[in-house]
Curated annotation (Swiss-Prot):
Protein name: GTPase Obg
Gene: obg
Residues of the Obg domain: 1-159
Organism encoding this protein: Rippkaea orientalis (strain PCC 8801 / RF-1) (Cyanothece sp. (strain PCC 8801))
Domain called OBG-type G: residue spans: 160-328
Gene Ontology process terms (BP): ribosome biogenesis
Length: 329
């Protein structure tokens, strides 16, 4: 399935039904009073969060959503039927913005959570409401009001507690496959991961923790280079960052600094989020190299530093122990 995490759509609530002009016409009431009913409410457009959905792909094909109009009032003071609501399912993690004002309308994170994005219009009043001592037979009624109309921007931010970050080909997908049941595409070249992957890693207690394998970031990601904005958005909700650095790289310390600079430039508190620095691919490096790089990194960061291998699974148990400790602290 294609992963789409951005969409722009149009929503419109239904128009309220018109009130009507009517009078009582019973056989034995020759001068019946006003009896025009009110119009019904227009339906509303309502978003419903669904944990079974993983993408905004459907909004590439359906961009306009309109609820039903309310029915006009009836004689004998009968109120018209309300218009049917338009229910639109979205993935959990969807943020909804007013496209024109940039106002945040809602953040749908819980399964079943709802958000009214375009309210239906109120039904018009029938002529019975205009009866007065001065006017015993009002011959006018009010039309229903138009429903709300909006253009929306939808952004999907993955709901994961741990975000795995690093430069392309740092081994993020291999690590994800080793830690969880996720089976991301893996190959020995940069940019294998073009969309975020989610995986659930089980604690010893049996509880699951969601990890997100974020596509490789590059220098300039905070400016949108290499789809950086789209990728960085998905780690905004994480509680912990697992920063993978390829120890076999020509300059692992510089690789670490590049990602840190991108987090700082993007803002939103990402650079201050708790981190674990994992020097990956220890199966292809010696202990002396590890200690040398670790020593340099300790001058740049107070985060825990550990050597691991996603291929041989070296150090993964120790890594997870640190993850659980930081999440529980």
């Amino acid at each position: 399935m294609q992963f789409i995490d951005y969409a722009e759509i149009e929503v419109e609530g239904g128009k309220g039904g018109d009130g009507i002009v009517a009078f009582r016409r019973e056989k034995y009431v020759p001068a019946g009073g006003p009896a025009g009913g009110n119009g019904g409410w227009g339906g509303s457009v309502i978003f419903v969060a669904n944990s079974n959905l993983q993408t905004l792909l459907d909004f590439r094909y359906a961009r306009r959503f309109k609820a039903d109009d309310g029915k006009r009032g009836g004689p004998n003071n009968c109120t018209g039927a309300n218009g049917k609501d338009c229910l639109v399912e979205v993935p959990c993690g969807t943020m909804v913005y007013n496209l024109e004002t940039e106002e945040i309308l809602g953040d749908l994170v819980e399964n079943g959570q709802t958000l009214c994005v375009a309210a239906g219009g109120k039904g018009g009043l029938g002529n019975k409401h205009f009866l007065s001592n001065q006017n015993r037979a009002p011959d006018y009624a009010l039309p229903g009001l138009e429903g709300e109309h909006r253009w929306l921007r939808l952004e999907l931010k993955l709901l994961a507690e741990v975000g795995i970050i690093g430069l392309p080909n740092a081994g993020k997908s291999t690590l994800m496959a080793s830690l969880s049941a996720a089976r991301p595409k893996i190959a020995d070249y940069p940019f294998t991961t073009l969309v975020p992957n989610l995986g659930v890693v089980r604690k010893p207690t049996g509880d699951g923790t969601v990890f997100a394998d974020i596509p490789g970031l590059i220098e300039g990601a905070h400016e949108g280079i290499g789809l950086g904005h789209e990728f960085l958005r998905h780690i905004e909700r994480t509680r912990l960052l697992l920063h993978l650095v390829d120890i076999t790289s020509p300059d692992p310390v510089k690789d670490y600094q590049i990602i840190q600079q991108e987090l700082e430039a993007y803002g939103r508190g990402l650079s201050d989020r708790p981190q674990i620095i994992a020097l990956n691919k220890m199966d292809a490096a010696d202990e002396e190299t590890f200690l040398l790089i670790k020593n340099e990194l300790t001058h740049l960061s107070s985060s825990p530093i550990i050597g691991i291998s996603g291929v041989s699974r070296t150090g993964l148990e120790d890594l997870l122990q640190i993850v659980w400790q930081l999440l529980d602290s």
